[in-house]
């Protein structure tokens, strides 16, 4: 009996200490604890661009990020979108030949992210961790991950998989985002396969950050990274943040380049798909695109198999609806979340953090579980 007890104790100690609850995507909604959830929050993006985590940088940036989490909670929000590698300034660590050797040279990245996730957990705030920036990508080592399978595998094996394994027990980890706005470095071009044909996007401004990658290479990279995440953590949610509605729907004559068939066709890995859609939206000259998220309801996009998050928006680049009305519109028109840009208040189309706090207050405590409504906002993460 003593030996049996000792064996059972050993098994219990060696077992992953998973929480009983994690954010889930089912059909067109997010769920937590059996309740439909609306991700109401902000983009932290970064405090120090590309240098918030890893190589000891978190010591100077972590306190500010935690203060921002406090502000999200105080305003009634529940989610923040946080950028990790960005353009590879600090992480991952590359050798002289461009192969990834580890998460970062001082190997602090995982502990940094773990600490922030634990803090967010205590404040009932979910974090979406964004791996790379596709709007701008000037690091040749990161660029080569899109072209060289052996280098991409070195990232997957030596940085990504260790991160996912170390963090998969964190209930505040809402999702992994492979790329922010990959259309920024898209090389528009024609292709017989509609998944890869982006010829119509050239006139829409795609490639503003430098025309570096054809769509097929982007989709293959997303497919491989998503597959690796799902291999390490089958329950993980994965997404991609598109610059607009133009590339994540087949409605209105557009093309959904990130649907399952396009991703698996490009990369060949059946589990290398995204678990929810994510559109970014800003007005131009004070006008929304006619089919922008704040002009139509989510059902108009016909992507009803997965949740749909408005991953970036700002009241200063809207049609003067007011930030609280924008949050309410998303909540009442079938969207599964809305995140303002951006809490450090830097750059164009960025609301002040005080205005973003005011915006989140519009949905504080909301919990409408009826059809077409957002669901629960005040989430008790445990």
From Swiss-Prot:
Active site, renumbered: 181, 312
Entry GO terms, CC: extracellular region
Binding site for substrate: 83, 144, 147-151, 180, 187, 204, 208, 243, 282, 284, 341, 348
Domain of life of the source: Eukaryota
TM regions (residue ranges): none
Biotechnology: applications noted: Potential use in mannan-hydrolysis industries which need especially low temperature and an acidic condition such as the food and the animal feed industries.
UniProt keyword annotation of Cytoplasm present: no
Cell compartment(s), UniProt: Secreted
Signal peptide: 1-19
Temperature-activity profile: Optimum temperature is 30 degrees Celsius. Retains approximately 20-40% of its maximum activity even at 0-5 degrees Celsius. Drastic loss of activity at temperatures above 45 degrees Celsius, at which the half-life of the enzyme activity is less than 10 minutes.
Enzyme type, top EC level: hydrolase
Region (Involved in stabilization of the transition state): 346-350
EC annotation from Swiss-Prot or TrEMBL: 3.2.1.78
Principal localisation: secreted
Intrachain disulfide bonds: 195-262, 317-349
Annotated phenotype, changing residue 284 to W: About 1.4-fold increase in substrate affinity, but 1.5-fold reduction in substrate turnover compared to the wild-type
UniProt keywords, alphabetically: Carbohydrate metabolism, Disulfide bond, Glycosidase, Hydrolase, Polysaccharide degradation, Secreted, Signal
MF terms in GO: mannan endo-1,4-beta-mannosidase activity; oligosaccharide binding; polysaccharide binding
The keyword Disulfide bond is assigned to this record: yes
Mechanisms controlling activity: Activated particularly by Ca(2+) and Zn(2+), and to a lesser extent by Na(+), K(+), Mg(2+) and Cu(2+). Activation effect of the divalent metal ions Ca(2+), Zn(2+), Mg(2+) and Cu(2+) is reduced significantly by the addition of EDTA. Strongly inhibited by Mn(2+), Hg(2+) and Ag(+).
Similarity-based family: Belongs to the glycosyl hydrolase 5 (cellulase A) family.
Name of the molecule in the record: Mannan endo-1,4-beta-mannosidase
Organism per entry: Cryptopygus antarcticus
């Amino acid at each position: 009996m003593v030996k049996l007890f000792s064996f059972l104790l050993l098994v219990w100690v060696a077992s992953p200490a998973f929480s009983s609850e994690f954010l889930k995507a089912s059909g067109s909604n997010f769920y937590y604890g059996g309740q439909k959830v609306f991700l109401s929050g902000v983009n932290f993006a970064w405090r120090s661009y590309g240098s918030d985590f890893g190589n000891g940088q978190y010591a100077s940036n972590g306190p500010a990020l935690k203060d921002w989490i406090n502000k999200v909670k105080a305003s009634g929000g529940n989610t923040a979108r946080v950028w990790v590698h960005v353009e590879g300034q600090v992480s991952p660590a590359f050798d002289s030949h461009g192969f990834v050797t580890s998460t970062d040279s001082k190997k602090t990245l995982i502990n940094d992210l773990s600490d922030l996730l634990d803090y967010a957990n205590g404040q009932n705030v979910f974090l979406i961790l964004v791996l790379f920036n596709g709007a701008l990508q000037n690091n040749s080592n990161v660029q080569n991950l899109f072209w060289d399978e052996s280098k991409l595998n070195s990232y997957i094996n030596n940085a990504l998989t260790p991160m996912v394994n170390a963090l998969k027990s964190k209930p505040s980890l809402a999702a992994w985002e492979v790329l922010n706005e990959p259309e920024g470095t898209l090389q528009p071009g024609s292709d017989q396969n509609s998944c890869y044909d982006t010829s119509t996007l050239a006139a829409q401004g795609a490639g503003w950050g430098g025309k570096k990658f054809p769509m097929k290479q982007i989709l293959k990279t997303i497919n491989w990274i998503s597959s690796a995440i799902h291999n390490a953590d089958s329950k993980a949610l994965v997404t991609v943040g598109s610059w607009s509605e133009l590339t994540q729907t087949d409605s209105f004559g557009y093309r959904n380049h990130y649907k399952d068939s396009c991703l698996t066709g490009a990369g060949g890995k059946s589990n290398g798909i995204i678990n929810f859609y994510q559109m970014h939206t800003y007005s131009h000259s004070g006008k929304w695109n006619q089919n922008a998220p704040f002009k139509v309801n989510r059902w108009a996009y016909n992507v009803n198999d997965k949740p749909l998050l408005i991953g970036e928006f700002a009241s200063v680049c809207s049609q003067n609806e007011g930030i609280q009305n924008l949050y309410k519109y998303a909540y009442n028109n079938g969207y599964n979340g809305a995140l303002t840009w951006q809490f450090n208040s830097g750059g164009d189309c960025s609301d002040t953090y005080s205005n973003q706090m005011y915006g989140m207050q519009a949905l504080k405590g909301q919990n409408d579980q009826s059809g077409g409504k957002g669901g629960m906002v005040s989430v008790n993460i445990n």
